[in-house]
Amino acid sequence: MDKAKKLNIEEAFCEYLAKNFRGAVNPVSSKTLEAIFHVKGTEIRRIVNSLRCKGEPICSDLDGYYYADNQLEINATIAQLSSRIQKIAQARDGLLSCANEES
């Protein structure tokens, strides 16, 4: 996918969430977004990550993605991301210790 197409789909995605799925009470599933935008789940996650990096308040929970309505929703997603970071770091550290033992 070329850069211009990526930007267009990101803009459309962000606008779609902001207009139709605001707040944690109104999430949309990844499967629904995949069908609407004709992309796979990995591309949905890439789009969400890119938009978050640009400062868009795209949040998520077990029920799906949504455009944040308030700071509490943003804080909940930040906490979720922080927890994932810690778990990934623990997995990395476990692999590093295994690699060090074999050296």
Give the label of every model feature segment.
Residues 1-16:
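Short alpha-helical segments that sit at the start of domains
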Residues 29-36:
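A short acidic, leucine-rich amphipathic alpha-helix
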Residues 73-95:
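Short, amphipathic alpha-helical interaction segments positioned at domain boundaries
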Residues 19-25, 54:
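Short helix-capping/hinge SLiMs at alpha-helix to coil transitions
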Residues 39-50:
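Short amphipathic alpha-helical interaction segments
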Residues 52-62:
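A short, conserved structural fragment
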Residues 61-70:
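Minor-groove-contacting beta-hairpin "wing" of winged helix-turn-helix DNA-binding domains
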Residues 97-103:
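Exposed, interaction-prone assembly regions rather than primary DNA-binding/catalytic cores
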